[in-house]
């Protein structure tokens, strides 16, 4: 789907660039595949702010998206493509041959009326899910499991994909969008194709209100605060903060590496920090 620009009839429309969504379904989602979602405003169960700059926004209902594709070797037909306010990608409503309805992440080049299936020996075409061990090397994939049966975790946002670049001793070698190369079990399932809505990265909200509609509040810089509120705060006139960037609690930020999961280091063949070639 293409990008849509507007005539500058108002200041908010002058810079506005959105994704043209005329091909998506305009009705309500399937009720049995949705559930209520309460707005947290960035607060935890004690009422304390644990995630700053969140709150407000339009009311949402959560769509149950099938990341596991456990219904194997049963053909399903794409009924429609839908907008999902809870993620950047579009979702597809599929109807299995036995009549069951389900939502899946919509890959690029998947249209209404197309057939999809999950299984061990299925065709390599967008929307079909299969184990990494049964895919040809070089396949573009998304919604990749990290543990067999756990459900897809890698490459789920708009336009994202990973590539199967090799196999080694029962493991599949994946190249991710970030440049990282990592090992995943060959029995893990993945879906063929790249995630829909690749133009999401090119949108321009045009005005602050569009961010507020999504539940995002203004992101205040530390140097604009008082010393009581932030380590970068205070000073006469505008200052640069006077030290390396830190969080409001004094921890280094902006590029400081925080990964500490040594147990899974052995699965990362090439980190995303190494220069991409």
UniProtKB/Swiss-Prot annotation:
<dbReference type="GO" id="GO:0016740">
    <property type="term" value="F:transferase activity"/>
</dbReference>
<dbReference type="InterPro" id="IPR012340">
    <property type="entry name" value="NA-bd_OB-fold"/>
</dbReference>
<keyword id="KW-0687">Ribonucleoprotein</keyword>
<feature type="region of interest" description="Disordered">
    <location>
        <begin position="222"/>
        <end position="277"/>
    </location>
</feature>
<protein>
    <recommendedName>
        <fullName>Large ribosomal subunit protein uL2</fullName>
    </recommendedName>
</protein>
<dbReference type="Pfam" id="PF00181">
    <property type="entry name" value="Ribosomal_L2"/>
</dbReference>
<comment type="function">
    <text>One of the primary rRNA binding proteins. Required for association of the 30S and 50S subunits to form the 70S ribosome, for tRNA binding and peptide bond formation. It has been suggested to have peptidyltransferase activity; this is somewhat controversial. Makes several contacts with the 16S rRNA in the 70S ribosome.</text>
</comment>
<comment type="similarity">
    <text>Belongs to the universal ribosomal protein uL2 family.</text>
</comment>
<comment type="subunit">
    <text>Part of the 50S ribosomal subunit. Forms a bridge to the 30S subunit in the 70S ribosome.</text>
</comment>
<dbReference type="InterPro" id="IPR008991">
    <property type="entry name" value="Translation_prot_SH3-like_sf"/>
</dbReference>
<dbReference type="InterPro" id="IPR005880">
    <property type="entry name" value="Ribosomal_uL2_bac/org-type"/>
</dbReference>
<dbReference type="InterPro" id="IPR022669">
    <property type="entry name" value="Ribosomal_uL2_C"/>
</dbReference>
<dbReference type="InterPro" id="IPR022671">
    <property type="entry name" value="Ribosomal_uL2_CS"/>
</dbReference>
<dbReference type="InterPro" id="IPR014726">
    <property type="entry name" value="Ribosomal_uL2_dom3"/>
</dbReference>
<dbReference type="InterPro" id="IPR014722">
    <property type="entry name" value="Rib_uL2_dom2"/>
</dbReference>
<dbReference type="Pfam" id="PF03947">
    <property type="entry name" value="Ribosomal_L2_C"/>
</dbReference>
<dbReference type="GO" id="GO:0002181">
    <property type="term" value="P:cytoplasmic translation"/>
</dbReference>
<dbReference type="GO" id="GO:0019843">
    <property type="term" value="F:rRNA binding"/>
</dbReference>
<dbReference type="GO" id="GO:0003735">
    <property type="term" value="F:structural constituent of ribosome"/>
</dbReference>
<keyword id="KW-0694">RNA-binding</keyword>
<keyword id="KW-0699">rRNA-binding</keyword>
<keyword id="KW-0689">Ribosomal protein</keyword>
<dbReference type="GO" id="GO:0015934">
    <property type="term" value="C:large ribosomal subunit"/>
</dbReference>
<dbReference type="InterPro" id="IPR022666">
    <property type="entry name" value="Ribosomal_uL2_RNA-bd_dom"/>
</dbReference>
<dbReference type="InterPro" id="IPR002171">
    <property type="entry name" value="Ribosomal_uL2"/>
</dbReference>
């Amino acid at each position: 789907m293409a990008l849509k620009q507007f005539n500058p009839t108002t200041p908010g429309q002058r810079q506005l660039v959105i994704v043209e969504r005329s091909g998506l379904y305009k009705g309500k989602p399937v009720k049995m595949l949705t559930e209520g979602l309460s707005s947290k405003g960035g607060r935890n169960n004690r009422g304390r702010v644990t995630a700053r700059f969140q709150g407000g926004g339009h009311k949402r209902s959560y769509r149950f998206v099938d990341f596991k594709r456990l219904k194997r070797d049963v053909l399903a037909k794409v009924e429609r493509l839908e907008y999902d306010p809870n993620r950047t990608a579009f979702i597809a409503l599929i109807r299995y041959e036995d009549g069951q309805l389900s939502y899946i992440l919509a890959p690029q080049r998947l249209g209404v009326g197309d057939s999809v299936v999950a299984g061990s020996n299925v065709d390599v075409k967008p929307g079909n899910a299969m184990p990494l061990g049964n895919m040809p090397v070089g396949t573009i994939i998304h919604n990749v499991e990290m543990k067999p049966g756990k459900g897809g975790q890698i490459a789920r946002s708009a336009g994202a994909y990973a590539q199967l670049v090799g196999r080694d001793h029962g493991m599949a070698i994946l190249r991710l969008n970030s440049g990282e190369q990592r090992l995943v079990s060959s029995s893990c399932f993945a879906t063929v194709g790249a995630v829909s809505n690749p133009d999401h990265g090119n949108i321009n909200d045009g005005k602050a209100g569009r961010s507020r509609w999504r539940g995002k509040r203004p992101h205040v810089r530390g140097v604009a605060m008082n010393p009581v509120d932030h380590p970068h705060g205070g000073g006469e006139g505008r200052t640069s903060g006077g030290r390396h960037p830190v969080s409001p609690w004094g921890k280094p930020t902006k590029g400081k590496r925080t990964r500490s999961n040594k147990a899974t280091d052995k699965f990362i063949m090439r980190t995303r920090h190494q220069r991409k070639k």
